Every structure is written in structure tokens, then in C-alpha cells.
Curated annotation (Swiss-Prot):
The organism's place on the tree of life at top rank: Bacteria
Residue ranges of the TM segments: 8-28, 356-376, 379-399, 405-425, 453-473, 478-498
Role: Part of the Sec protein translocase complex. Interacts with the SecYEG preprotein conducting channel. SecDF uses the proton motive force (PMF) to complete protein translocation after the ATP-dependent function of SecA.
Record's protein name: Protein translocase subunit SecD
Name of the gene this protein is made from: secD
Keywords annotated in UniProt: Cell inner membrane, Cell membrane, Membrane, Protein transport, Translocation, Transmembrane, Transmembrane helix, Transport
Principal localisation: membrane
GO cellular component, as recorded: plasma membrane
Length: 525
């Protein structure tokens, strides 16, 4: 009999893999590591609601802005262009331009699907219901991507950003320790960073302070807060351009050595910016960020180059965060913090300590029982359990999985599952030995008889783990992940690994005079 057999080689390979990839996580050395969840590490957990209705409004606003700009270029006379949640509406003043208008709408439609209604020169344009639903879904995905991008630029390690429900997003930020870090992270995540250039309604702005939002709406305008001057300012409702055309944003210092955010527009945005400023010298244009006016300077001359600045008495950190938000892209819909929980690092450490005590304590008790009851067979089973634990840690580290408190519970459960497998195998071997059969036959029949039951129970548990991971959330996923990995590891260690060890030891086992030493049982008299 060869000392090294295929099963033993697989077991040794699993041991080396497990130890090799577990070391970085256990000893904090370089290499792939397990990410500790909030409940173990401490940090900030937020549940965000995405207001997808606003994404639809912004879509119609952008469409109205593009329609107004291109209609003027093509000398198509339009009147009363209005935009709301239902779509955009306007009047075509010259019916002879209908074909040109239809061609323009077809061009603006792009890959979207419009519903266009015409009646006596009055038009209404809106997205189809299917297109609206698709827009809402894409908005959630876009917001998730932007949040991840911002957090990466902010320098936060291992943030978790996932969709939860239809229009909600769960954000977990391990390692947030101070109130200042919490505030900055919350502001960075919740800021829409929706940049717009809007014309001041010079005709009616003098009455802005006593005007209501409804009165402004009837004028085709909108009332916004003026950060620079205080009070309200009246702007034309249809923006000149928006942040979709922004290509870069960075912190610079003005002539007073105050931090401001400089932004750059793409070629299309620069052209629109230049055309508008050239045609409106002497009038004011407002720089609007998240529905707040940061400045509304008078246009002195045509502004070329497609760049501008946002100032607002920012600190360096605030200006830096704003630049990050602008660079990562504007959210097409604002978000609202629905729930916020802070888990302190001390609580996380206590959780880790308690979990490790439970795991190690349970492991020692199990090992003690196995050795006392099954003798050397119990020692072999304990070796398989150790390899099982190393494999769980290694696989989670390789894939960058997050270990949570429920995940630790899953590992403890896995120890029990792996022990069950070894108990079944040892009992089947002992049953055959009690029938005065040889050791080689007892081991062979023991594994054959036990494997079927082990596979059946483990496959059932594995299916349950997969379903829990697929349809569960947060804590449930953590539990399902470690349980699933542990089940697969237990199959390798219990069925393949221990059998390989017995095959290697078989020459010695067949010559033994003490079955009790090896299996804790004597042959039947």
C-alpha cells in the first residue's frame, strides 16, 4: 500500500491551501484577507431611499432644455415650454415648422421611447410606461455606482453598497470611528451633486421675496435659495445645461486664497455655455447645485473654454468632498437617509472576542468528546475539523467575503455538521468491526455506508444555504455564506481527507492488536 494516495494528496493540498490563505487574515500580514462586517469591526450602517420620481422630472427637464436650445438653433418657434412629472408640454407657433419639429423630437428621442400627442399646435411628450420603469431601475443602479465611486475616492476601505428592496439602498461603512468621519461620509453619500446653469428671470426677480412657489411656476420659473446673497432668487425653470456635461472638478484657490471648486464641461456643454453667454451679455446666469444658487454673476462677455467655479465659503474638506461628488457624477435622483445606525469599535471588538470564545470553546469540547469516545479515530476527525476551519477562512479571504456575527454562528454550526459526518463514518466502521470483519474491509464498508447519508444531508443543507444567500439580506447572507462554504469543506475533509489518512495508515492498522486504541471499540467476542 502506498503511503501517499490520491485522497491523502487532496487532503494535504486542502490543508496547505487553507493555511496559506488563512495566514494574512489571522496574523494581519500581506495578502487576501477576510473583511470584517460592521457588527465585528464597528462603523456606520445606513438605509437610503431613492426618490425615482425626481429622476423622471430631471429627465424631462434635460429634454426640455435640449428642445429649447435646438429649436432656437433651427428657428423653430416654441412657446410656454413646461416640464413636470407627467412630461413636457409646449406650443408650436408656426404649423409650417411641424415637420422640422418632428425630426428634432425624433433626434432627441435617441434610444428612448416617446409618446407624443399633438392637438392644434399644442404638444405633450412623455416616456412610455415601460421606458419610465426602465429609467427607475437604471436610476437605482446609477446611484449605487456613484456612491461606490465617491466612497472609493473618499478613501474608505471595503464599503458595502447593495440594493435592498425596490427603491432602497443599504450602505455599510466599516471603520467609521468619529462623528466628523460620520458627517462627511453621510454628506458625501446623500449629496446629489446635480449641477445646473440657469438663467435669472430678470423681469420678475424683483418680486421673488414675496412670491410663492406656485406663482413662480405659473410664470414658467422656479424659486431657489440664494446661498451667496441670502433670501430667494427667481430662475427660468428650464436649465441652460446640467451636470451630465461635466467632465472634471477640482479644488483650486481664488484671489482671496479661499478654496473653490473649478469645473470643466465637455465640448457640447462648452458650446451651449458659450452660445448662451454670448447672447445674454449684461444678464445674470446662476450656478445651481442641488437646488441651491451658489452664485449668479452678470455675464460681461462671451465665456469660452467651458469652465467655471463654484464658491460658497467652503472649508478645504468641504470643497474636496464637493469636487469628489461632482467628479463621480450627479445622481439623477436625490436620496433620503431612512435609517442610520452607528456600531462603535468597542462593541465590534467585544463581538469578535465573544464569538471567538464561543467558537474555540465549542471546538475544544467537540475535540475532547471525539478523542475520548473514538480514540485515534477521534484525533483524525479533529484534524479534519481543523482543516475544515482553515478552508472556510481561506475561501472567504480569496473571494474577499465579509465575515459578520451571523457568519461566525454559521462557522460554529459548520463545526457541528462536520462532526456529524465524522461520527457517522466512525460508527459505520465500528459496526463492521463488531462483526469481526477485517480493518481494511471495515474502513471500506464504513465509508461506503456513511457517504450516502452524509451526501444526502449535506446537499439538502447546501441547497438551503444557497437559497438563503440568494433571497436573504444582510445578516442572513453572512450566515448562509459561511454555512455553505463549511458544508463543501466538510465533504472534502470528512469523506475524502480522513479516508486518505486511513488508507495511508492501513498497513499499520492491519497489524494492530488494539482496536480500542484506534477506534475505541473491541471486536465482538
Amino acid at each position: 500500500m502506498k503511503l501517499f494516495n490520491a485522497r491523502l494528496i487532496v487532503f494535504i493540498g486542502a490543508l496547505l491551501l487553507g493555511v496559506g490563505f488563512s495566514v494574512p487574515s489571522l496574523l494581519e500580514t500581506k495578502g487576501p484577507k477576510i473583511t470584517l462586517g460592521l457588527d465585528l469591526r464597528g462603523g456606520l450602517n445606513m438605509l437610503l431611499g431613492v426618490q425615482t420620481d425626481e429622476a423622471l422630472k430631471n429627465k424631462y427637464l434635460s429634454l426640455a432644455s435640449a428642445l429649447e436650445y435646438n429649436a432656437k438653433k433651427q428657428n423653430i418657434l416654441l412657446k410656454d415650454i413646461k416640464s413636470n412629472l407627467e412630461g413636457i408640454s409646449f406650443e408650436l407657433l408656426d404649423e409650417d415648422e411641424a415637420k422640422k419639429l418632428d425630426a428634432l423630437l425624433l433626434e432627441l428621442q435617441g434610444h428612448s421611447q416617446f409618446e407624443i400627442k399633438k392637438e392644434a399646435g399644442f404638444y405633450s411628450v412623455n416616456l412610455t410606461p415601460l421606458e419610465q420603469e426602465e429609467l427607475r431601475k437604471n436610476t437605482i443602479l446609477q446611484v449605487i455606482g456613484i456612491i461606490r465611486n465617491r466612497l472609493d475616492q473618499f478613501g474608505l476601505a471595503e464599503p458595502v453598497v447593495i440594493q435592498q428592496g425596490k427603491e432602497e439602498i443599504s450602505v455599510q461603512l466599516p471603520g467609521i470611528k468619529t462623528l466628523e468621519e460620520e458627517r462627511r461620509a453621510k454628506d458625501l453619500i446623500s449629496r446629489s451633486a446635480h449641477l445646473q446653469m440657469m438663467a435669472v428671470d430678470e423681469e420678475h426677480n424683483k418680486d421673488a421675496m414675496k412670491m410663492t412657489d406656485l406663482e413662480a411656476q405659473k410664470l414658467g420659473s422656479v424659486l431657489l435659495s440664494d446661498v451667496e446673497m441670502g433670501g430667494k432668487i427667481l430662475l427660468k425653470a428650464i436649465p441652460i445645461l446640467d451636470g451630465e456635461m461635466l467632465t472634471d472638478a477640482k479644488v483650486v484657490y481664488d484671489q482671496n486664497n479661499q478654496p473653490v471648486v473649478s469645473f470643466t464641461l465637455d465640448a457640447q456643454g462648452a458650446k451651449i455655455f458659450g452660445d448662451f453667454s454670448g447672447a445674454n451679455v449684461g444678464k445674470r446666469m446662476a450656478i445651481v447645485l442641488d437646488n441651491k444658487v451658489y452664485s449668479a454673476p452678470v455675464i460681461r462677455e462671451r465665456i469660452g473654454g467651458g469652465s467655471g467655479q463654484i464658491s460658497g465659503n467652503f472649508s478645504v474638506a468641504q470643497a474636496s468632498d464637493l469636487a469628489i461628488a461632482l467628479r463621480s457624477g450627479a445622481m439623477s435622483a436625490p436620496i433620503q437617509v431612512l435609517e442610520k445606525r452607528i456600531i462603535g469599535p468597542s462593541l465590534g471588538k467585544d463581538s469578535v472576542k465573544t464569538s471567538i470564545i464561543a467558537l474555540v470553546g465549542g471546538f475544544i469540547l467537540v475535540m475532547g468528546f471525539m478523542v475520548l469516545y473514538y480514540s485515534m479515530a477521534g484525533v483524525i476527525a479533529c484534524l479534519a475539523l481543523v482543516v475544515n476551519l482553515f478552508l472556510i477562512v481561506a475561501v472567504m479571504a480569496i473571494f474577499g467575503a465579509t465575515l459578520t456575527l451571523p457568519g461566525m454562528a454559521g462557522i460554529v454550526l459548520t463545526v457541528g455538521i462536520a462532526v456529524d459526518a465524522n461520527i457517522i463514518i466512525n460508527e459505520r466502521i465500528r459496526e463492521v468491526l463488531r462483526e469481526n470483519e477485517g480493518i481494511a474491509k471495515a474502513i471500506h464498508l464504513g465509508y461506503i455506508n456513511a457517504s450516502r447519508a452524509i451526501f444526502d444531508s449535506n446537499i439538502t443543507s447546501l441547497i438551503a444555504s444557497v437559497l438563503l444567500y440568494a433571497y436573504g439580506t444582510g445578516a442572513i447572507k453572512g450566515f448562509a455564506l459561511t454555512t455553505g462554504i463549511g458544508i463543501l469543506a466538510s465533504i472534502i475533509t470528512a469523506i475524502v481527507g480522513t479516508q486518505g489518512i486511513y488508507q495511508a495508515l492501513l498497513p499499520k492498522l492491519t497489524q494492530t492488536k488494539s482496536l480500542y486504541f484506534w477506534f475505541g471499540v473491541n471486536k465482538r467476542a
